[in-house]
Amino acid sequence: MVPPLSRRDALKALGIAGAAALQPPGPVDTGARAAAPILPLTSTSDVHVPPRGRSFLKFSFDHPEPSVPFEGFSFGLMVFTRENAYGLDQARMSVHETDGGLEVRATGLVWAGGQQRADGEVRLALRRIPDGVEWDATVAMDRPIKAVTTVLRGVPRGRVAAGGGAFTDPGDDELLFGYPFGGGDLFVAGGMNTPLLQVEEAGGGCCYVASRDTAVRTKRFYLQPGGQGYRIEAVHEVEGWKDEHRVTLPPWRVGRAASLEAATAAHYAHLAQAYRLPDWDTRPDVPDWLRRTALVTTLHGMHYTGYIFNDYPKMLATLRWMAARMPGERILAFLAAWDGRYYWNYPAYELDPRMGGERAFRRLIDEGHDLGVRFMPMFGANAANRHQPSFPALAEAATAKVDGDTMDLNWVDWDNDRHMEGWLAYMNLGVAAWREWLGGRISAMIERFGVDAYFLDIAGGWVNNPRADMHAGIRQLVQDLRARHPGVVAVGEMHYDALLEVLPLFHAGGGGPAGPHVQRHARFFQHLSHPAPGRGSTGVHEEGFSRFDPDTLSLAPHAIPTLNVVDDTLARHQDLMDAVIRRARERAGI
């Protein structure tokens, strides 16, 4: 909570005492009394110093955070360029009443913890809304602006939920969440599919903080606990491919809702309008066969090491066995690592001779279609091996983060030498060279073999970068392929909010408190790493093994029943395969 002001601090904030010290050189507005005090807070105000639990990196001094109280909260700003961090200069701040709120103006900034001044202009607009406060801001400097953070106080301590997830108790830990894909630091921040933060209050209600943006742009939420409440940083990061000297923040909101569900429902109503999210029941990119799909089977092909779980003939034998137990037209076959060595062969996407070559693959598709089965091969939306001969022509699409540091897909130990490999470039679909290459490889599979869908791995991996918008890129890829191949379905691994407009089916997410709101727009099946019956092998996925529950069959209630097939599944675990198929038939009423 905001501490009470001493008389002297209140006088200073109102510009009544110490005016000579607070005012910048030149003319000063000496008109009406300030509409609200300016609180002389710093980065260490109202938080535990030192931290009492898990913590994140922070300044080791008192960075100025002059803030304005409004409707039970206080609001301050920080500005980040590509070379430093800036705070508002309290001596050059003023507060003015507006219709329904306040406007905070700053005609200068400080840096070096307040030891130095800088030019810059800031306007922060605070507005009352029925359940809290909405705000936006405009910031101008003489250099490109990287990010603008709102520093928010007045949110009480409590259990925390991120992105429409469930409440968890962090104790005295600091928290950091990033949208989307961890907000650019995948293994530092907790992920969130939409920029919504909720803190539980006594009596079952919650306090929420949410961005009302209408474009995919990085957001981060940092929560620092104090004795009574949280100091929250709500970070908006500017598009990395733009050199913006003047930035207008999209609206943010903080408020109180009767429940977690009430806050989530209001947020998803905004998303549906902002991103034109189609309803599942009427979306035009969902053919009838997909609506009738009752079982997804992931047929694992070749591991990174070259180990084959299922070659093309074995995949066909498995589908024949399944189609004898449920109608084949209710089965979608997801072909994982159909193209040889998993990820190593990216982005060639060519049939593998060890798995049977073109003749066996064509027979798999043709005879599978005769059974009614639909087919979906896997492609990496943003992965390319630098050692592949095609890479030099695509290198311009390799991703760097917003600060320019190269981003590789380097978080997997593919060969088990207990070290993460770094030969995979993380590619940007916003760059035409990569988008056209990948679209061409997908199109070739559709034209040559008549596959019914294509799967985009790491589809939700949007990263802010200096080159191009990844969301615009994936939208363009899907639109181009849809124009060339009407009726062929685009599917993704995981989603963020705006991606629900582009893709109708995913295989990660869709559950939790936000599940009903997400599933209004899309459907989900279970992940590639879902354990196969028996020992729980994850097939080509790097996890290795996880527990398969023979009682629940490891089926998620919110997802299309999914049966993962590895090397020993058909030979040794037909009883469990039968059980999964029976459960799928029961759910579908077959």
Provide a role label for each language-model segment.
Residues E244-H245, P250, G439, A468-I590:
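Active-site-proximal substrate-binding groove within the catalytic cores of carbohydrate-active enzymes
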Residues P4-L5, P24-I38:
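C-terminal segment of N-terminal export signals and the immediately downstream linker at the start
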Residues L39-L332, E367, R374:
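Carbohydrate-recognition beta-sandwich/jelly-roll modules
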Residues T298-P313, N345-E358, M420-E436, A459-D469:
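The substrate-binding groove and active-site-proximal loops of carbohydrate-active enzymes
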Residues M302-A395:
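Aromatic- and glycine-enriched glycan-recognition loops and surfaces
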Residues V2-A17:
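N-terminal secretory signal peptides and thylakoid transit peptides that target proteins
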Residues P377, A381-A444, A522:
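Active-site-adjacent "subsite" loops/lids of carbohydrate-active enzymes
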Residues F334-A337, L438-P466:
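Active-site groove signature of glycoside hydrolases
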